[in-house]
């Protein structure tokens, strides 16, 4: 059995996943990092990280991942960091059922499948940590993010319910809720909105053009955006603290959003959000 604590981290091609995989490896963890494409393996393997192929939309790859990790570690899985996701932008009325379903396949159903597959290993050990990289948009909705909002709100519900159900088992569940973080997330969102939204024939065409200008870099820059190390700080706490928190809200805008949601009347709060989307 592996002597080092074992963690599975998903979505490690770039951004938060890649950074956290490297940081945990340097901090003494045995890291199993997942990517969807073989060409993304080399950079991680060069750091001494064990890399496996996994796609949340393909159940057979999820099952194979868990089987392979268990085989290599003698059945030890100490932690899971669900991180791989993407954001489908677009007005709710412009999101087809097929596009919405794909958003949930990646951001919710795949996460649920993987989580449920590692829990039996953690139960046998009498301990474990499950951390979901959610989003501030799982707590505070933004316009033109309905599909992504919905997937993260669903994840919040599943995650906190699971935390409550696992109380006393030695398995702790935490949700990390970042605001703007430097990553390839925006570039991926841009690709999906162009592929799945009929922009020119939408009642929201003018707003789409404004948002595309921002996503493509000709709009205002978000001065509150942090690097992935901000996520790692809270991930490390969630993995190692005796009493990990249920929620870790990251970045100033995210913390402000949570506070204002608590303090303001709902109608005023939602009107205020229109100024920041």
Question: Model segments located where?
Answer:
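Active-site helix of classical SDR
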Residues: 115, 151-154
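A short, exposed helix-loop element centered on a Lys and neighboring polar residues
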Residues: 115-116, 160
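Conserved glycine-rich cofactor-binding loop
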Residues: 13-14
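C-terminal beta-strand-loop-alpha-helix "lid" module of Rossmann-like NAD(P)-dependent dehydrogenases
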Residues: 168-219
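Residue(s) in the substrate-gating loop at a strand-loop-helix junction
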Residues: 135
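Substrate-binding pocket helix/loop in short-chain dehydrogenase/reductase
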Residues: 91-92, 99-101
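Rossmann-fold cofactor-recognition segment
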Residues: 46-60
């Amino acid at each position: 059995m592996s002597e080092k604590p074992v963690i599975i981290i998903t979505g490690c091609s770039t951004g938060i996943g890649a950074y956290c995989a490297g940081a945990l490896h340097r901090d003494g963890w045995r890291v199993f990092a997942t990517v969807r494409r073989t060409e993304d393996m080399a950079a991680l393997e060069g750091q001494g990280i064990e890399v496996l192929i996994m796609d949340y939309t393909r159940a057979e790859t999820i099952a194979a991942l868990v089987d392979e990790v268990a085989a290599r570690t003698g059945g030890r899985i100490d932690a899971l960091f669900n991180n791989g996701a993407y954001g489908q932008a677009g007005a709710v009325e412009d999101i087809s059922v097929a596009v919405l379903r794909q958003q949930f396949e990646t951001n919710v159903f795949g996460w649920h499948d993987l989580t449920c597959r590692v829990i039996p290993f953690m139960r046998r050990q009498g301990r474990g940590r499950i951390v979901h990289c959610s989003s501030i948009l799982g707590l505070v909705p933004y316009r033109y993010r309905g599909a992504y909002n919905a997937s993260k709100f669903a994840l919040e519900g599943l995650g906190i319910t699971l935390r409550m159900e696992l109380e006393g088992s030695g398995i702790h569940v935490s949700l990390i809720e970042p605001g703007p973080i430097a990553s390839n997330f925006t570039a991926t969102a841009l690709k999906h909105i162009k592929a799945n939204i009929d922009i020119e024939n939408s009642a929201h065409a003018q707003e789409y053009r404004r948002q595309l200008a921002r996503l493509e870099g000709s709009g205002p820059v978000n001065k509150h955006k942090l690097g992935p190390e901000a996520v790692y700080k809270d991930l490390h706490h969630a993995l190692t603290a005796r009493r990990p928190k249920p929620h870790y809200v990251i970045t100033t805008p995210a913390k402000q959003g949570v506070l204002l949601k608590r303090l303001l009347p709902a109608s005023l709060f939602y009107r205020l959000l229109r100024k920041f989307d």
